[in-house]
Amino acid sequence: MKILADENMPYVQELFGDLGTIETVNGRELTPEQVKDADVLLVRSVTQVNGSLLSLNNKLKFVGSATIGTDHIDTDYLASRDIPFSNAPGCNATAVGEFAFIAMLELANRFGGKLKDKTVGIVGAGNTGSAVAKCLQAYGVTVLLHDPVIQDSDPRDFISLDELIARCDVISLHVPIIKTGEHKTWYLFDETRLNSLKPGTWLLNCCRGEVIDNRALIKVKQQRPDIKLVLDVWEGEPNPMHELIPLVELATPHIAGYSLEGKARGTYMLYQKLMQVLGRDADKSMTTLLPSLWSVQLDIESIPNEKSLLKLARFIYDLRDDDELFRKTILDDSSKNDQVNCVNNNGFDLMRKNHQHRREFRALRLVNTGHSDVNWLTNLGFSGVGQ
């Protein structure tokens, strides 16, 4: 059996190696010729899987995408050919949640005020949005939710988008791309909606770039520097509008979900599904793939100080490093080369390929040397919190 896998998917050899021959490929440049002999195709969001890509293949047994979203997959086409498909919903939700939480701590540290005193609105309350809410609520932050798709079947309280914008100091976006219909999210934040943001609003986008009209965002941000931006996703990836980048407070190349646990979880979920399709038992464990936990002793009485919490979070992941590298890679390189799109493309994807996957909070085992209540740190995700 021939297994064709994106070169940036981790643990493919460890999980799929005894099922057949593995060939890794550049997912963004995948061609029908490369796919024609594959029995299994494993992709990420950079690969458009459709009739054109699979036009030369008549033996495909399974397509798996190690992603939450499926907007890059023509699921109707796969169904018409009876090709089993699976994605990995929720695989990197914890990573995205912690990324957004850390970004908010960074903004609070940079611009003053406390995150705990703010009201945060989450647009899209699925796996990733709920993970953000979990972190914030563990820390004691007031959270409001907007999600018209699930509000009728979900017991949580929801409000309209207009009300959320009017009431919230921070807005974090976690919706899939929907191009048409009642729940359209393409340019959900257009120029009018961007101009309706409260003074001093923090706006974070960790879902899809086109949820915000980036050209309108440039115009609004130039007129309203009070708005603070965290962008992990960009319209037109892998070629972000380079004039937008200097206007953004924290900028990264679509790596919010890039934790080691999240990436491993995505690959492992596809392994489980393929074994089910093949009628075989999944006899491998994800826990054997990951490095051991770190242990840190500290007096947790000091952590309620927000700067101390940020310091602890930076021990796991210092977002400033990726922000600095992103600006250097995209802006510095493009200024030296007339072929901006080519440079941005290479730099953007190269950053994603070479990204050192951070660990999630659970990888850090805290040993409490004080005598304070530590349940909130457990709820935030840290391991082994106790005395």
From Swiss-Prot:
Q: Where is the active site?
A: 208, 237, 254 (proton donor)
Q: How is the quaternary structure described?
A: Homodimer.
Positions that bind NAD(+): 147, 232, 257
Q: Which HAMAP family match?
A: PdxB (MF_01825)
Question: Which biological process, per GO, is one annotated for this protein?
Answer: pyridoxine biosynthetic process
**Reaction catalysed by this enzyme:** 4-phospho-D-erythronate + NAD(+) = (R)-3-hydroxy-2-oxo-4-phosphooxybutanoate + NADH + H(+)
- Give its localization: Cytoplasm
What is the protein name stated in its UniProt record?
Answer: Erythronate-4-phosphate dehydrogenase
Q: Does the keyword Protein transport apply?
A: no
Q: Where does substrate bind?
A: 45, 67, 258
Cite the EC number.
Answer: 1.1.1.290
Q: Which family does it belong to?
A: Belongs to the D-isomer specific 2-hydroxyacid dehydrogenase family. PdxB subfamily.
Q: Which Pfam families match?
A: 2-Hacid_dh, 2-Hacid_dh_C, DUF3410
Q: What class of enzyme is it?
A: oxidoreductase
